[in-house]
Amino acid sequence: MLWEFFALFAIAAALFYRWASANNDFFKDRGIAYEKPVLYFGNMAGMFLRKRAMFDIVCDLYTKGGSKKFFGIFEQRQPLLMVRDPDLIKQITIKDFDHFINHRNVFATSSDDDPHDMSNLFGSSLFSMRDARWKDMRSTLSPAFTGSKMRQMFQLMNQVAKEAVDCLKQDDSRVQENELDMKDYCTRFTNDVIASTAFGLQVNSFKDRENTFYQMGKKLTTFTFLQSMKFMLFFALKGLNKILKVELFDRKSTQYFVRLVLDAMKYRQEHNIVRPDMINMLMEARGIIQTEKTKASAVREWSDRDIVAQCFVFFFAGFETSAVLMCFTAHELMENQDVQQRLYEEVQQVDQDLEGKELTYEAIMGMKYLDQVVNEVLRKWPAAIAVDRECNKDITFDVDGQKVEVKKGDVIWLPTCGFHRDPKYFENPMKFDPERFSDENKESIQPFTYFPFGLGQRNCIGSRFALLEAKAVIYYLLKDYRFAPAKKSCIPLELITSGFQLSPKGGFWIKLVQRN
């Protein structure tokens, strides 16, 4: 009996080894330089074992590529062709975009799937959609992020930002010994903005700190060990996940957002309510609200899942990603007092020019140094660590006289953080220097070396929204407070090694010093 057990174990181990190492010679067979993978974990073992931050691992892999323009790496069993040359990035994302239209098919659903199945909303989002479905949805959503729409949305952001600072002044208990948990503060702000601009809800998470909308959002965006393992399985065992119907996100939270969107659509239709937010725009796209414009432009019938998914991913991306940008901005201003002082002087000047009136969209868009500061934060701490593309038809690249063939199904990887921290493109990359993005210097930045929101037609559709949110928060905080190091501040900043999110060990803590 014991021998039978050992025999079965040996067979299982052999089968696992064969499966786990099946792609190990992928780059060797093509004559492409690569980093030797660890069995099953590829080159990401440190991240999955929670020993190193993914951000640091990707930066190291980029550096190991040396002078190679293409360099092979592995994410678990998945071979990724890392691109280390700006000209090749331009070719992939612009010139030959028709070969690289899609992100890889990790979460995506097909048009044949049950349109009423809400278990995989991320798979029906704009990010995961493919080919013609992506193009149609991109066209549907684009009007929501034009300059005129941003101007309308800014009125709401402005109000929420003022309320957030007012709550700090009114309730000192939320600031422990003048030390503020910036992550908590910023996620509450992004939560309230998105509640209104996407879902049509009025929420104040600074006063009603346990409101349902905020609590459900926290559940969705907090990456526990189990959540990280689910992500790992989604990447490694896509087919099995579909058979077993593994749900990536908490079911209760997902169902909450599904009902929120569908009930809002039903109520608005019954009561003829029109509101300038994402739900209204998606109702127009679906034909629930008929306008001359939508009659002329309707090209596809969207399902309930398609509609809900766009609101869902807008919340998911905005809740966490925008908040992290705000937190890193505050942290860098705290560590670089000279930069903070110069930015404060710009804030003072704008405040004086407004003569007691509310901050306007035009005023904040005209703040050049604030724009430089935020751009430099995005260079040093890009939320999108890397950008991927899946090849949909064979193509051959001529790289320094060598023919490199990329086949249908191959995955291209553009390491954002690697380029942003490469001294070849950004001198002294670890220095926080907003002057890189001044009018005099920004033209010298080599094209396709700075892409915090992606590149080409598949860049982040909500980038302008995220930038506007971050600028509003920093403006109001800096107007009334100086950022100083707190006892809990992580200096120098070290990233946590758990999960996929960018965050310092111990969190984002800032000491607020009241200005006279």
Curated annotation (Swiss-Prot):
What is the first-listed, main subcellular location in coarse terms?
endoplasmic reticulum
Q: What SUPFAM superfamilies has UniProt attached to this entry?
A: Cytochrome P450
What GO terms fall under cellular component here?
A: endoplasmic reticulum membrane
Task: Specify the protein name.
Answer: Probable cytochrome P450 9f2
| Topology of this chain in the membrane | Peripheral membrane protein
| Cofactor(s) essential for the protein | heme
Entry keyword Iron: yes
Q: In which family does this protein belong, per the annotation?
A: Belongs to the cytochrome P450 family.
UniProt organism field: Drosophila melanogaster
Q: Where in the cell is it found?
A: Endoplasmic reticulum membrane; Microsome membrane
What Enzyme Commission number(s) appear in the record?
A: 1.14.-.-
